[in-house]
């Protein structure tokens, strides 16, 4: 039986790091840390359509985010406040955070889809 897993990936435009919000973020003290945290949060939210949740009922807290991003809680709390001010993250009514514009960054594929793409490429190269 074939192993057909679904994969999610983050698609960044070539100009991602030139966007105003990212330039402003990285120009701040600890901005490179914040940028790193932001990318990790985008990746963490992919499977949930942009929501930062451990599961359907448990939204990530600042402490949990600090643990998964390997950063200090204070750094994560400051980063989240800045992300909200810049419109990169929005709080939801259930306490979860939503990564704004995530729909522009999400891609998905499956192992079966990848296998078919490889076959098509091989046929085109013949």
Question: Where in the sequence are the language-model features?
Answer:
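Charged low-complexity intrinsically disordered patches
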Residues: 2-3, 107-126
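Amphipathic, positively biased hydrophobic alpha-helical segments used for protein targeting
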Residues: 42, 98, 122-124
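Positively charged, structured surface patches that bind polyanionic biopolymers
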Residues: 1-94, 101-106
């Amino acid at each position: 039986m074939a192993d057909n897993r679904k994969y999610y990936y983050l698609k960044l435009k070539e100009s991602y790091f030139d966007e105003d919000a990212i330039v402003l973020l990285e120009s701040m003290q600890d901005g490179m840390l914040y940028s790193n945290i932001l990318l990790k949060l985008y990746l963490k939210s992919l499977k949930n359509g942009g929501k930062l949740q451990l599961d359907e009922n448990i939204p990530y807290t600042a402490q949990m985010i600090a643990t998964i991003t390997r950063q200090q809680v204070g750094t994560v709390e400051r980063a989240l406040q800045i992300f909200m001010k810049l419109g990169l993250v929005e709080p939801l009514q259930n306490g979860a955070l939503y990564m704004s514009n995530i729909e522009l960054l999400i891609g998905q594929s499956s192992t079966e889809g990848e296998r078919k793409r490889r076959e098509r490429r091989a046929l085109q190269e013949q």
